[in-house]
Design a protein with these regions (language model features):
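Pyridoxal 5′-phosphate
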Residues: 1-361
Length: 361
């Protein structure tokens, strides 16, 4: 977490000692500022097309509730995604009798990501109502071809739902380019915010939908505190209807706003370039040692997986990492590497040294 973000959080906690500075307008200025920064980050048409959602599972529950699908239809998802982007569809398939097509990665090394993308496109048919995937896979950084998925979805009348948690903030994303129907993102990852915070985009498909939660702030005219007991049937226009209760959260919301503002200032394209320039020489060294890494066209620069050659042992390489204070994530048989602006060449040198020791063992 950025120091400036932490400072805002600490200050907000102490502000609770004297809440007199909070005016009725503060509830809505807070949320508008956050939505505005997120809309800028993903190129959304307006802040009102975005909603503050505390988690991916919360946002996807809203998507699931409003998906127009039933028995005889199907949904297509990539396999081994983060659980939130499976459980929502697994539950919905059982509830409504919708077929859930889970597309696994092929058991191959060369061309694995390209073939996986092809398999996803092949799984989409005229009964498909939704495709749900990430921009990059959370375990190994496999990049999914969102433009091709959107094109195929248009051909069959399906919607596209993107979990952007592992990419938004570090990998450029454009609503106008990819035309997703929904984009959900947790704030604690590449947007560098606190836990229990996040923002989502809901497109035209969802603009007249029904949210999973009925709170006072997602109702029409909730800005008028004097008339809150004049209960409203109508929701706020746009995507704000899907916002979580207490979205004005005077601690988490300003923290995430500041974090995304900083990411916007840096620019995801610059972060991606920095990560590419930082890692490229060391990726070449790792490949020479037999480590398997996806081709550049089909992986993120900010997140990618390393798969060990047969003569290296996962438990032993983890020991090498521990000795060198290298912090990575093990996801199945993939070692997930996720650099950012705070990483230096010396970090990558220590990483490669761990593999060199194993290669000579």
């Amino acid at each position: 977490m950025l120091k400036s973000v932490a400072e805002i959080g600490v200050r907000a906690i102490y502000d609770k000692d004297d809440p007199s500075s909070n005016r009725p307008e503060s509830f809505f200025e807070n949320t508008s500022a956050l939505r505005t920064e997120f809309a800028k980050l993903i190129g959304a048409p307006s802040e009102r097309s975005c909603a503050i959602t505390p988690s991916v599972s919360y946002a996807l529950a809203n998507v699931a509730k409003n998906l127009k699908a039933g028995k005889g239809d199907n949904m297509v998802i990539a396999d081994e995604q983060f659980p939130s982007n499976f459980y929502a569809w697994d539950a919905l398939s059982k509830e409504r009798g919708i077929t859930l097509k889970v597309v696994s990665a092929p058991d191959m090394i060369e061309g694995r990501a390209q073939r996986w993308n092809e398999l996803i496109l092949e799984a989409i048919d005229t009964n498909t109502k939704m495709i749900a995937t990430g921009h990059v896979h959370w375990a190994d950084g496999t990049k999914f071809n969102l433009a091709a998925i959107r094109k195929r979805a248009d051909e069959v009348g399906a919607i596209v739902v993107i979990d952007g948690t592992q990419s938004i903030g570090a990998l450029p994303f454009s609503v106008s380019e990819f035309r997703p129907d929904a984009v959900v993102a947790a704030g604690y990852k590449w947007m560098m915010g606190p836990y229990a915070s996040g923002v989502s985009y809901f497109g035209e498909y969802f603009q007249d939908g029904s949210p999973i939660e009925n709170n006072w702030m997602n109702r029409l005219n909730s800005e008028d505190f004097g008339n809150l007991v004049n209960y409203q049937e109508q929701y706020q226009p746009g995507s704000i209807r899907y916002e979580v209760g207490e979205s004005a959260n005077f601690i988490l919301t300003p923290m995430l706003t500041r974090a995304i503002a900083q990411v916007n200032e840096w620019g995801p394209e610059n972060i991606q370039t920095y990560c590419e320039n930082l890692t490229t020489p060391y990726i070449s060294e790792l490949r020479e040692l037999g480590v398997q890494i996806e081709s550049e066209a089909y992986r993120g620069r900010h997140l990618f997986g390393l798969r060990l050659p047969s003569h290296m042992n996962m438990e032993e390489i983890k020991q090498q990492f521990a000795e060198r204070r290298i912090f990575v994530s093990i996801r199945g048989n993939s070692i997930r590497i996720s650099p950012n602006l705070y990483n230096l060449e010396s970090d990558l040198e220590r990483l490669v040294d761990s593999f060199k020791v194993m290669d000579h063992a």
